[in-house]
């Protein structure tokens, strides 16, 4: 039986609920987040995406630096039924970003606070 990314996440959540899944550097130390804690955040964000109108099969982009919320955001997209259209934070030109969003038929964009100005620069186009 083929497994989805959701299946591959759910399995260790069941088997190792209190084990560390993610580490994030805050200051000089790394803060652990368990599988259960990540699952709760993923479920909450996924439900929020659905409440905002994300439907199964909608194309959605995620523009974020590599960090825990990137992992949580991508999993939440999958739980909401969205299809992830990959973007690189290295897209410097607004027309490159716009091209990918338009040609990827992206309906929703999840973006980190530090990269928000890149998305805002093309909203009116």
Protein language model annotation of sequence segments:
Residues 21, 60-62, 109:
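Short hydrophobic beta-strand segments
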Residues 12-13, 122-125:
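Hydrophobic helix-cap positions at the C-terminus of alpha-helices
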Residues 31-32, 47-91:
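Conserved AMP-binding/adenylate-forming
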Residues 42-45, 70, 97:
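Aromatic/hydrophobic pocket-lining residues that form the small-molecule binding cavity
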Residues 1-33, 37-52, 56, 80, ...:
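N-lobe entry segment of adenylate-forming
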Residues 27, 38, 66-67, 89-90, ...:
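Short beta->alpha junction loops/turns
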Residues 9, 73, 119:
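Aromatic/hydrophobic pocket-lining residues that form π-stacking "cages" and hydrophobic walls in ligand
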Residues 91-123:
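Conserved ATP-dependent adenylate/AMP-binding module captured primarily in the ANL superfamily
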């Amino acid at each position: 039986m083929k497994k989805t990314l959701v299946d591959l996440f759910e399995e260790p959540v069941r088997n190792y609920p209190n084990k560390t899944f993610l580490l994030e550097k805050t200051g000089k130390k790394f803060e652990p987040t368990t599988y259960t804690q990540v699952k709760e955040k993923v479920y909450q964000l996924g439900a929020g995406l659905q409440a905002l109108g994300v439907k199964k099969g909608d194309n959605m982009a995620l523009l974020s630096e590599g960090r825990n919320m990137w992992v949580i955001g991508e999993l939440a997209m999958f739980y909401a039924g969205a299809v992830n259209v990959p973007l690189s934070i290295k897209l410097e030109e607004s027309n490159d970003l716009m091209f990918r969003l338009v040609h990827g038929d992206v309906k929703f964009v999840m973006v980190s606070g530090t990269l928000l100005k890149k998305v805002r620069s093309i909203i009116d186009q």
